[in-house]
Amino acid sequence: MKDYPEREKKLFRLLDQGIDTIENTPAQYQNLTFHKLFGYYGSKGIVLRKETFEDNLELRTNDGEYNLMAQLLSDNSHMPLRVSIFTGRTKGSNLYSVREFGNDCLLYTLDELLRYGDVLNIIQADERDRIVERKDVPLFDDKAFREAIINAILHNAWVEGNEPMITVYSDRIEIMSRGTLV
């Protein structure tokens, strides 16, 4: 350990304070509002009470500061999520489009990303073995896309300050989450 003082320092900090999570990591921004969160919950038929929602959703650290989860659920999360579309099969291909989502309540961002999947899912004609009718084939499976997006957001290592990355190529979609399964 003496040869690696940074690792030793990190290990002792981990043993003393535990693993950094979105619940115990203070938000980078403390002047947060939650109007959109109330609207989102209301649209699902769930009533949040202003007096208790912070405790019920565990939006504060033990020191009373807003935590990272509060920042993610606030009206401005300061966390952009980008969808990059390339014309070919690699990042060396021309960049066709970049669409930015986020900087919003993460629940709204998730809904927007899932709706954008409908735009991306181009129907292609499969002319192989055609007799009379051609077969319409979507670019990807809707359910698989939905599951991958939700997992990328849920399992992302938000405490490291990185967002999931979605890249669309001519033959596939890559959804990268900077986290691990718990």
Give names to the regions the model predicted:
Residues 1-182:
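Active-site helix-to-loop segments that bind/position phosphate- or nucleotide-bearing substrates
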